[in-house]
């Protein structure tokens, strides 16, 4: 089994229900099981500010799937919950599932970049991850705690 960390975010169509349904759906992925779920956090949007706040969370998932197979499942879950992929970056969305870490793997493919390309600059991804994996080290050896301290991002409010 490989321990994978997935970031969840939603700011449309009842975010709490969206994220709860996504956590349930992640638990239904074959050859996988949810082993930890963070609290739910309220964070301001990244990019355009004329949209609702986000609900952000993190899930730890044990899986025997390949990274691409897991990505197929996370994208299927997003689509089933009404995710529409638009050219607009950082726009509002019903559900966003990002594979932040896939064990100690470093992946740079057309479909997937792991560790997530900008997670070390995003407190809304790091704080939920820190809650469920406070002793985590990134594949490059950096401690999550040190990255959070360096970023200086305040812990987000609870949802």
Language-model features: where?
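Short, structured patches in soluble enzyme cores that scaffold and shape functional sites
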Residues: 8-10, 63, 130
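N-terminal beta1-alpha1 ligand-phosphate binding loop
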Residues: 1-32, 37-44
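Flexible, gly/pro- and Lys/Arg-enriched active-site loops
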Residues: 31, 45-54, 65-159
């Amino acid at each position: 089994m490989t321990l994978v960390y997935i970031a969840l975010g939603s700011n449309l169509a009842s975010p709490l229900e969206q994220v709860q349904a996504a956590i349930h759906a992640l638990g239904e992925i074959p050859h996988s099981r949810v082993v930890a779920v963070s609290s739910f956090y309220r964070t301001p949007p990244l990019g355009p500010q004329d949209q609702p706040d986000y609900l952000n969370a993190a899930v730890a998932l044990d899986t025997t799937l390949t990274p691409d197979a897991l990505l197929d499942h996370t994208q299927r879950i997003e689509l089933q919950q009404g995710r529409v992929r638009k050219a607009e970056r950082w726009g509002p969305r019903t559900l966003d599932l990002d594979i932040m870490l896939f064990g100690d793997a470093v992946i740079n493919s057309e479909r997937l970049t792991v560790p997530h390309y900008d997670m070390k600059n995003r407190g809304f991804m790091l704080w939920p991850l820190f809650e469920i994996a406070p002793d985590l080290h990134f594949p490059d050896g950096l401690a999550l705690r040190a990255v959070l301290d360096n970023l200086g991002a305040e812990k987000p409010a609870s949802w």
